[in-house]
A protein has these predicted regions:
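Short coil/turn segments at secondary-structure boundaries
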Residues: 59-63, 83-84, 94-95
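Long beta-strand-rich cores associated with HINT superfamily self-processing modules
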Residues: 85, 90-92, 97-193
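An acidic, glycine-/histidine-flanked metal-binding catalytic module
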Residues: 1-43, 144-204
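Surface-exposed, low-hydrophobicity interaction/linker segments
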Residues: 32-79
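Short low-complexity stretches enriched in small and charged residues
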Residues: 11-18, 45-56, 97-106, 190
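Hydrophobic alpha-helical segments with strong N-terminal bias
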Residues: 9, 77-79, 115
Length: 204
């Protein structure tokens, strides 16, 4: 049994959970090629459809459906030139824990786009993981499958809670990742101490 099936998922179920846009156009188009409210209402309809979808009860893994506020906020952050499928690529997102990222990378199917962040982003902000995006075609909103080791999940959560949307430079997260790997913190209390130290150094 594969990693997906162990958690109650399968390509077939993901297809059933994929929401087809009602706009009649490929979601590869950029945000500014759609009328703003029509696109937002389409994305919000996807979230509402997922909210009441009984198929999610079959899934034995953490998931979250993006809120209306988050959908609108992401539109504003990404407008005008980002494709819709890269903006609203996580209206439905599943979170997996894995022992090794090779487990996630082995899930190579035509419908999956793999984004390997296990060694960091192009501009490293400390985050580590592997993201898979499931999409039957370009007229459906993608579903995000986020894989992290337990070790990385802990730091990712702290980075999200303390740095996300606060406009700190990526170097802050990168410095925290280095300190984490050096063993300088392993609890929320020691994380906060190291964060304060890193921020004070940035201000000098």
């Amino acid at each position: 049994m594969g990693l997906l099936e162990l958690n109650g998922l399968s390509p077939e179920l993901l297809t059933e959970l994929s929401y087809a846009s009602q706009l009649g156009r490929s979601l590869k188009n950029n945000l500014d090629s759609f009328e703003k409210e029509a696109l937002l209402q389409d994305a919000l309809a996807a979230a509402e459809w997922l909210d009441i979808n009984p198929l999610l009860a079959e899934v034995a893994i953490d998931y979250r459906i993006k809120s209306a506020e988050s959908i609108r906020s992401k539109y504003e952050r990404c407008y005008p030139h980002r494709p819709v499928i890269k903006t609203f690529n996580d209206i439905l997102g599943f979170r997996f824990c894995c022992d090794d990222y090779r487990e996630a990378l082995s899930l190579a199917l035509p419908q999956f786009k793999i984004v390997d962040l296990s060694h960091g982003k192009a501009v490293d902000d400390g985050y580590r993981g592997v993201h898979l995006y499931y999409q039957p075609d370009n007229f459906h909103y993608p579903i995000e499958l986020q894989f992290n080791t337990l070790y990385d999940r802990q730091l990712n959560n702290w980075l999200h809670d303390y740095l996300y949307k606060k406009n700190y430079p990526a170097s802050v997260g990168q410095a925290l990742r280095t300190r984490y790997e050096q063993g300088d913190f392993c609890t929320i209390q020691t994380f906060e101490e190291v964060l304060n130290d890193v921020l004070s150094r940035c201000e000098r």
